[in-house]
């Protein structure tokens, strides 16, 4: 069974309220950085992931001014995906991560031209880290009666997939590539 970082109801609610009231990646890679070592094992973490309409960088800078911490961010034009994205998307943020103590927020600009950005699909639960096998097992369990948007597959930044579960909750999954 995979190890999942669990927040108390109070911690999760405080994070959600803070984010609502206010409105992760190294520069060279989109590899998972939220994996924590636990006795030689990797732990899967659960992080809020916010999607913005072209102002992700400004929003994350604002959150940094509130929470402090370290902000890492990458634009489409600086990523390996640049050749696969239209010119209109090049200045948008493909991924950002703010880490300040126990507060972690991941985000990007809305990059799906094939799906509209509407209230309800601009935030999701982001499972990252662990092993690809653990992530696959969780993806399969949550896929029951789900709407799968992106099947789990290898990408330039690791294993990735996304779905809306049978209750309408949006989930994103990411693990580092196998070495």
Task: Kindly label every feature range from the protein language model.
Residues 104-106:
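Conserved, structured core segments of small domains
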Residues 1-7, 16-21:
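N-terminal secretory signal peptides
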Residues 43-47, 120-124:
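Short, solvent-exposed beta-strand edge segments and adjacent coil->beta transition regions
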Residues 4-13, 27-32:
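Twin-arginine (Tat) signal peptide motif
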Residues 40, 50-102, 160-162:
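Core segments of cupin and vicinal oxygen chelate
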Residues 154, 173-179:
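Short beta->alpha transition motifs characteristic of CBS
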Residues 27-44:
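C-terminal segment of N-terminal export signals and the immediately downstream linker at the start
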Residues 56, 65-66, 111-118, 125-166:
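Vicinal oxygen chelate
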């Amino acid at each position: 069974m995979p190890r999942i970082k669990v927040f108390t109801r109070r911690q999760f609610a405080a994070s959600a309220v803070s984010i609502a009231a206010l409105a992760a990646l190294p520069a060279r890679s989109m590899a998972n950085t939220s994996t924590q070592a636990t006795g030689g094992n990797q732990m899967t973490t659960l992080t809020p992931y916010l999607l913005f309409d072209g102002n992700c960088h400004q929003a994350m800078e604002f959150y940094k001014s509130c929470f402090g911490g370290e902000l890492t961010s990458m634009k489409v034009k600086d990523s390996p995906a640049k050749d696969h994205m239209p010119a209109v998307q090049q200045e948008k943020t493909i991924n950002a991560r703010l880490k300040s103590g126990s507060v972690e927020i991941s985000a990007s600009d809305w990059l799906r031209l094939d799906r509209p950005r509407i209230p309800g699909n601009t935030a999701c639960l982001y499972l990252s880290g662990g092993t690809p096998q653990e992530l696959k097992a969780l993806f399969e369990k949550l896929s029951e009666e789900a709407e799968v948007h992106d099947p789990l597959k290898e990408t330039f930044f690791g294993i990735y997939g996304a779905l809306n579960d049978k209750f309408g909750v949006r989930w994103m999954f990411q693990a580092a590539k196998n070495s």
